[in-house]
């Protein structure tokens, strides 16, 4: 790896890969979470931590709720129970791909899935952990009203939402909080008349939220290097943009 663009497939932890500025950026006092939510099955439905994609896309055309859980100590996303990994992360969610996923899928047209969603976010996720919930394709309030007209809205109210309420039209939303800390809520819903809350008055959402941190280190992990019969040496060169203090 030599050219800066070659590094975009690396994995970053507590380091933000800024391709446009060609910089690795360290933000010592916060970690950025952002999410893109589209009113369709776009592969661009995705969320990121400090610029590193955690997971993306939707599994089918059935509107899901995607739930991401972020550990407040490591700022790493929980993974799903798959093939022996994360055996304690089975919350009644739907599994989509043949790998560990970094969000938990709950379909909005199933009463059983809605109940499993409520149990997960209220009872299985510890206080202090970060929750990102987004409705890719659409929030199916119509289904909520038919299947569980009280508990779904009460669940979001218990998490601190004041915008995910009865009477909303079916549109995507994004919701973020540190569980147990209602003052940390960041949420975005779309006004179908004015387009307020959407990206450029379209039906998509781009939302940013921040997680305060005192972490003083980060990591960058490259993709697999090779194959090769033998490696003799590895070299790393870095030019810091910060002033050098020799005092």
Sequence positions of predicted segments:
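Hydrophobic side chains in beta-strands
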Residues: 69, 134, 176-177, 236
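Beta-strand-rich ligand- or partner-binding modules
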Residues: 1-38, 59-61, 200-247
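Structural beta-strand/beta-sheet cores of well-ordered domains, especially the beta-sheet scaffolds
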Residues: 128, 171-173, 232
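Short loop/turn segments at secondary-structure transitions that flank enzyme active sites
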Residues: 73, 138, 181, 228, ...
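Extracellular and analogous surface-interaction loops
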Residues: 69, 119-126, 179-180, 220-230
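Conserved mixed alpha/beta catalytic, RNA-binding, or beta-rich assembly cores of soluble enzyme
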Residues: 45-131, 136-138, 142-143
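N-terminal, charge-rich interaction modules
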Residues: 14-77, 182, 186-205
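Contiguous ligand/interfacial binding patches
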Residues: 139-211
């Amino acid at each position: 790896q030599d050219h800066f663009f070659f590094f975009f497939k690396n994995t970053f932890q507590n380091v933000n890969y800024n391709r446009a500025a060609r910089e690795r950026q360290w933000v010592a006092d916060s970690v950025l979470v952002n999410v893109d939510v589209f009113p369709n099955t776009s592969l661009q439905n995705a969320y990121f931590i400090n610029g590193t994609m955690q997971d993306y896309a939707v599994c089918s055309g059935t509107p899901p709720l995607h739930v991401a859980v972020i550990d407040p100590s490591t700022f790493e996303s929980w993974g799903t129970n798959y093939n022996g990994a994360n055996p304690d992360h089975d919350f009644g969610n739907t599994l989509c791909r043949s790998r560990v996923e970094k969000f938990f899928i709950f379909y909005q047209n199933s009463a059983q899935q809605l109940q499993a969603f409520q149990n997960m976010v209220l009872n299985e996720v510890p206080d202090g952990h970060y929750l990102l919930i987004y409705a890719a394709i659409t929030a199916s309030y119509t289904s909520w009203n038919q299947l569980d007209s009280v508990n779904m809205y009460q669940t979001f109210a218990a998490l601190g939402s004041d915008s995910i309420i009865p009477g909303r039209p079916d549109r995507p939303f994004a919701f973020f909080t540190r569980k147990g800390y209602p003052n940390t809520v960041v949420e975005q819903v779309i006004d179908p008349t004015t387009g307020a809350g959407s990206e450029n008055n379209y039906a998509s959402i781009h939302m940013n939220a921040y997680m305060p941190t005192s972490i003083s280190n980060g990591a960058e992990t490259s993709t697999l290097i090779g194959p090769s019969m033998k490696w003799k040496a590895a070299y790393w060169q870095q030019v810091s943009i910060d002033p050098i203090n020799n005092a």
